[in-house]
Curated annotation (Swiss-Prot):
Catalytically driven reaction(s): phosphoenolpyruvate + UDP-N-acetyl-alpha-D-glucosamine = UDP-N-acetyl-3-O-(1-carboxyvinyl)-alpha-D-glucosamine + phosphate
Pfam families: EPSP_synthase
InterPro entries: Enolpyruvate_Tfrase_dom, Enolpyruvate_Tfrase_sf, MurA_subfamily, RNA3'P_cycl/enolpyr_Trfase_a/b, UDP_GlcNAc_COvinyl_MurA
GO terms, molecular function: UDP-N-acetylglucosamine 1-carboxyvinyltransferase activity
UniProt protein name: UDP-N-acetylglucosamine 1-carboxyvinyltransferase
Organism: Helicobacter acinonychis (strain Sheeba)
Modified residues (2-(S-cysteinyl)pyruvic acid O-phosphothioketal): 117
Pathway field: Cell wall biogenesis; peptidoglycan biosynthesis
Protein location: Cytoplasm
SUPFAM superfamilies (UniProt xref): EPT/RTPC-like
Coiled coil stretches, renumbered: none
Length: 422
């Protein structure tokens, strides 16, 4: 198992190229199961979750041809079976995204209950209710979801009690081959969902309301879609993380290959804290702040402040003057990084879903353990400003969602080594 050794308090400067968005690539990869045609997906990030999804598709019988590490040609014309097994699904929660496409196209599938980050209760019941609304029979058998729709899926209204990104994506994909019109009410509005809509539209699916909380989908009257090639959008969470690298080290950094509109909640907060930003069409440059002010954050669904940036801003709060408050409203148990930040010297108190961070604090290098994907990046941020050497363990969490993070940070002047545990 690997860990990262990080020498703190080194000045950083330069630019970072942002990779394709993992959270856009995963549903788009799953959606290729709806198609009988070859489709090429470019700008795929080279991260563990993408490799896991590619392995799952290959196991189902899809033909995969990697042109290079970021471009993949797929063909799901003839699958061997429609069972997504535990061995493959347990590696990440996003595996549940194959449920909608498999059910819609093949009328029956078995999908293991998923794994991935251990962040509180992330139930799949919203996905199952959506499939049932489209006419599926659902049973849970020995840890597997067994979904059947012998006569195919039929369009219907799907009302989500709670906004769900992957739930919306599964419903969208299933509705693409359902007979008639489906309305998804209280849909998630993330840019990654908008790109999935674009991909499905390229295959002939009519979708109204893209980017809004209500989507209207007219299913294609055929057995499969004819999807067109697509390039994955830049990863707004990776971009936000590197903006935080600049912010916590108070360095001048340029973040390239981004869509600034997708980052507005993050950039607004950085400006509020005191950072001058130069926002261009596809880049953002962050400059050192004269004074970093404490702040308050409440995580919300897009376009609100993303829960996937909460941990990074908690690390940043340790270097801001005054008392910062972070309220997590979307997931339970998403403050597991707080105790590890405390090991570095952070002054953090927790009460249910609210974290209070007192700054600014001088951090000291130590051994810390990543508990999930975004927590791992928060610990690396803190280590960059800690006095001495830090070691971040269990970075397999990091590798699920960040492409070559140590290489990108080292190119800015940092000293980060990937080493093997003894």
């Amino acid at each position: 198992m690997d860990f990262l050794e990080i020498v703190g308090q080194i000045p950083l400067k330069g630019g970072v190229e942002i990779s394709g968005a993992k959270n856009s690539a995963l549903p788009i990869l799953a959606a290729t199961l709806l198609s009988q045609q070859e489709v090429t997906i470019s700008a795929l990030p080279q991260v563990a979750d993408i490799k896991a999804m590619a392995s799952l598709l290959q196991n189902l019988g899809a033909e995969l041809d990697w042109f290079n590490s970021h471009t993949l040609k797929l063909c799901a014309k003839s699958l061997r079976h429609t069972e997504a097994t535990y061995d493959l699904v347990r590696k990440m929660r996003a595996s549940i995204l194959v449920l909608g496409p498999l059910l819609a196209r093949f009328k029956e599938c078995l999908v293991s209950l998923p794994g991935g980050c251990a962040i509180g209760a992330r139930p799949v019941d919203l996905h199952l209710k959506a499939m049932q609304q489209l006419g599926a029979e659902i049973t849970i058998e020995q840890g597997y979801i067994h979904a059947k729709a012998a006569k195919g899926l039929k369009g219907n209204d799907i009302l989500f009690d709670k906004i769900s990104v992957t739930g919306t994506e599964n419903a969208l994909m299933a509705a693409s081959l359902a007979k008639g019109i489906t309305r998804i009410i209280n849909a998630a509005k993330e840019p990654e969902i908008a790109q999935l809509c674009t991909f499905l539209q390229s295959g002939g699916v009519e979708i109204e309301g893209v980017g809004s909380s209500e989507l209207k989908i007219r299913g294609v009257e055929s057995d499969a879609l004819s999807l067109k090639d697509i390039q994955i959008i830049p990863d707004r969470i990776e971009a936000g993380t590197y903006l935080c690298v600049g912010a916590i080290t108070n360095s001048q950094l340029k973040i390239n290959h981004i869509i600034p509109n997708h980052l507005q909640a993050i950039t607004d907060k950085l400006i509020e804290i005191g950072f001058p930003l130069d926002i261009q069409q596809n880049s953002i440059e962050i400059y050192p702040a004269k004074k970093r002010q404490a702040f308050e954050i409440t995580t919300k669904e897009y376009p609100g402040f993303p829960t996937d940036m909460q941990a990074q801003f908690m690390a940043l709060a340790t270097q801001c003057l005054g008392t910062s408050v972070i309220e997590e409203t979307l997931f339970e148990n998403r403050f597991m990084h707080a105790s590890e930040l405390q090991r570095l010297g952070a002054n953090i108190s927790l009460k249910t879903n609210i974290a209070t961070i007192h700054g600014s604090t001088e951090l000291t290098g130590s051994d810390v353990m990543a508990t999930d994907l975004r927590a791992s990046s928060a610990l690396i941020l803190a280590a960059l400003v800690a006095k001495g050497v830090s070691r971040v363990h269990r970075i397999y969490h990091l590798d699920r969602g960040y492409e070559r993070l140590e290489d990108k940070i080292n190119a800015l002047g940092a000293k980060v080594l990937r080493l093997k545990e003894k």
